Amino acid sequence: MKAVTYAISSLIMAASLPSLAQSPSPQTSPSPQATEALPPGPNPNSQYRLGPDSLPQAGVPKGEIRGPYTLPCQAYPGTQHTYWVYVPAQYDPAVATALMIYQDGQAFKDENGDLRAQNVMDNLIYRREIPVMIGIFINPGRRPDQPEPSPTNWGDDTTNRRIEYNSLDDKYARVITEELMPLLYKEYNISKDPEMHGIGGSSSGAIAAFTVAWERPNDFRKVLSNVGSFVDLRGGYVYPERVLASDRKPIRVFLCDGRNDHRGTLRGPYDEKMDWFLQNVRLLKALTQKGYDVNYTWGVNLHGQKFGGAIMPDMMRWLWRDGPVSTEPNDMVERGFRQPVTKKD
């Protein structure tokens, strides 16, 4: 039985999809200093707080974060990616496990940040609300002489992030599937089933995650998108038309955005191709019209992780809702919390 969702996608299936020109502009990210008008009243982010599922809980086994590791990049010669590996306490090398990859890994694993994905996985795995899974926190590529991204500087101006994440080709998908995944398969017992592979991100990391699944649906089937930059940074606003013009792909998508995300005036006069909220809604309508397994939540949040972090546990539950389950009444293992695997000498 499917989980209760935030909104019923079928309600918007008949909605019209505004048509936009199909020639993307190879532009760069807007200036982080740019400001836009906000509605009167409290800060739009003021109501969003992390809940207990995003915080360490007494008695819940904590996974281990290993790394950092360095991945030399072939798709973008001269660059390298730093990544960390989350290994849950319940990981058993004898049992194939699920996989979740987070772009802008430094932000998703930040213990004082707005996302704290490792806590979410600890809590939900323990309560059997998502499968046991390996988590990967991967940063955008950079040259060795460039600084590592940090929670306060995600690297738009100092790394390869803008190009890797916002481009609509398959080069970043190659980084993940052809360069990173073979290393993970060697080290961990990760399922080869694409239904057991998820990928997510925030802002440009969200469109990057969508592009990986779009280009490689036989490798990734679940996409978590927070304030996705489906705008004209490097042509991302064309995705709704691409979705409608293509055969439906076997991917599941959760879109999260806010009414006070960047609203099209970062570069001056209003430009609908640079309206984050509009473009997320357009993508939702296209995915719904084509029959995708898609869910969404629209808040009043600004661009950032406040709202996405607050509902990340629910996004993860929905994306991973259909894992195997035992209904045997005497299965006391299934009826109990997932316990850590005893490590063998």
Residue positions per predicted region:
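Non-catalytic cap/lid and distal C-terminal segments of serine-dependent acyl enzymes
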Residues: Q22-D345
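Cleavable N-terminal signal peptides
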Residues: I8-S9, S19, S54
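Bacterial N-terminal signal peptides that target proteins for export
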Residues: M1-S10
